């Protein structure tokens, strides 16, 4: 709990000190890079300070150009690991409530993150459509296809929004697998444990080979690839090699 308190206090101070001038700079220059990277590097620094090590593999598999990154979601601890591992500025579909955070919410907006209300179907569809248009215009995205954090660390069923985006925009999907984050911080826990999180980029998948009518096939293919890339205790029950 002390580690969580440390991050909460010092990250809040960091946001208060660094956030306002960067927000003003972004509003004037229309360049979201500084506010984005200040946020990513700041969170990564505090995560490391409390004893969480992050290892990254497979960077050479990331294709040039716009792509859609998809990752499994097991814990609040995997978000900084996954975002920090991606070596380019990306946008994210974030739940609407996060945009209400002071300073951070404004930074999310200026970084072109898109708010989504998962509880309202029409609103969620509109958010996916907006993100798809951003993909088409050259903005890479990160999506958690499970839609929410896994309760036990195992890969869950996927929603179809990510593959619909990739097929419609004609961009490759880059699967990412994150292991160990659920042991660092559980889904319903505020306690941060020291440990290691491994983030691995898998081989990209060419979504342009699929039509929208084949979205279920692509969705299942991406899930199978990610399940195979996870350690046995994070694979879905019944999947080959699952513990």
Question: Model-flagged regions — what are they?
Answer:
Residues 46-47, 108, 134, 166:
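A generic structural signal for well-ordered alpha-helical segments
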Residues 125-243:
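Non-catalytic C-terminal accessory region of glycerolipid acyltransferases
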Residues 18-37, 49-50, 57, 63-121:
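Catalytic core of membrane glycerolipid acyltransferases/transacylases, capturing the structured
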Residues 58-62, 130-133:
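Short amphipathic alpha-helix with an adjacent loop that forms part of the alpha/beta core around
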Residues 38-46:
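N-terminal nucleotide/polyanion-binding subdomain common to many enzyme families
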Residues 48-57, 124-125, 181-183:
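Short gly/ser/thr-rich secondary-structure transition/capping motifs
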Residues 1-27, 33, 37, 60-62, ...:
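Membrane-interfacial terminal anchoring regions of lipid-handling membrane enzymes
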């Amino acid at each position: 709990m002390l580690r969580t308190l440390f991050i909460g206090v010092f990250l809040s101070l960091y946001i208060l000190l660094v956030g306002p001038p960067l927000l003003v700079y972004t509003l004037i220059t229309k360049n979201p890079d500084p506010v984005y990277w200040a946020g990513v590097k700041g969170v990564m620094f505090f995560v490391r300070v409390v004893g969480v090590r992050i290892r990254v593999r497979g960077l050479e598999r990331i294709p040039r150009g716009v792509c859609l990154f998809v990752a499994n979601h097991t814990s609040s601890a995997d978000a900084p690991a996954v975002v920090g591992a991606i070596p380019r500025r990306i946008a994210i579909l974030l739940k609407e409530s996060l945009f209400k955070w002071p300073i951070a919410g404004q930074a999310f907006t200026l970084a072109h993150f898109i708010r989504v209300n998962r509880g309202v179907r029409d609103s969620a569809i509109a958010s996916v459509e907006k993100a798809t248009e951003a993909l088409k215009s050259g903005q890479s995205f990160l999506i958690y296809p499970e839609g929410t954090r896994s309760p036990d660390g195992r890969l869950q069923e996927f929603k179809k929004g990510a593959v619909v985006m990739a097929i419609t925009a004609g961009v490759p999907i880059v699967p990412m697998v994150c292991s160990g984050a659920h042991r660092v911080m559980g889904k319903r826990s505020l306690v941060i444990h020291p440990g290691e999180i491994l983030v691995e980029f898998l081989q990209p998948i060419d979504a342009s080979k699929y039509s929208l009518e084949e979205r279920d096939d692509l969705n299942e293919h991406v899930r199978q690839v990610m399940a195979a890339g996870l350690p046995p205790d994070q694979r879905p029950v019944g999947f080959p090699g699952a513990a």
